[in-house]
C-alpha cells in the first residue's frame, strides 16, 4: 500500500514512480495507491511522484503545505529522494523542499542547511525571503530577514541587515 510501490493498481498513472521514489515508501502516512497518481500527492510526507497538480490537492483528501504557491505542477520530486519532512511550513515550491526543512523551529546558534527551501537565516522566522543579503544600504529591512540583525543606528527599523565587521 505504499505510495511509491506502484503495485497497487496505479497503472499508467504511475508516471515513473518506481525507482525515483527514494525513501518515501514506509513514510507515506496512509496515502495508499492514490499517491502514485501524478495529480494526487497531497500528504506532507508522500511526494515522490513526478508531479502534483496544486489545483487538485483538495480532492486528494490531504494537505501538501506550500502547494498553493507553486502555481502549477511540481516536477522532479522523485529525484529529491525521501519525504517532505517539516518543509511544508516553509511554504516552499522547489524540489529541494523535499529534504528536511532547516529552520522549522529556529536556527539557534547554527546556520541552516543548504537544502532549505528558502535562504538561510539565524532567527526563529526562518525560511522566509532574505531582505538584505548585500547589506543595509538605503532600503528598509524586513523582520524576517535571514541575516543577523544590525546594531548600527543607520540601519532601518526593524533592524535586520548583515552588518559589516
From Swiss-Prot:
Tissue: Expressed in hair root but not in skin.
Presence of keyword Lyase: no
Record keywords: Keratin, Repeat
A GO term from the CC aspect: cytosol
Disulphide-bonded residues: none
Intervals holding Sequence repeats: 35-38, 41-44, 47-50, 116-119, 126-129, 145-148, 155-158
Repeat found in the keyword field: yes
Domain of life: Eukaryota
Region (7 X 4 AA repeats of C-C-X-P): 35-158
Subunit record text: Interacts with hair keratins.
Protein role: In the hair cortex, hair keratin intermediate filaments are embedded in an interfilamentous matrix, consisting of hair keratin-associated protein (KRTAP), which are essential for the formation of a rigid and resistant hair shaft through their extensive disulfide bond cross-linking with abundant cysteine residues of hair keratins. The matrix proteins include the high-sulfur and high-glycine-tyrosine keratins.
Protein's recorded name: Keratin-associated protein 5-7
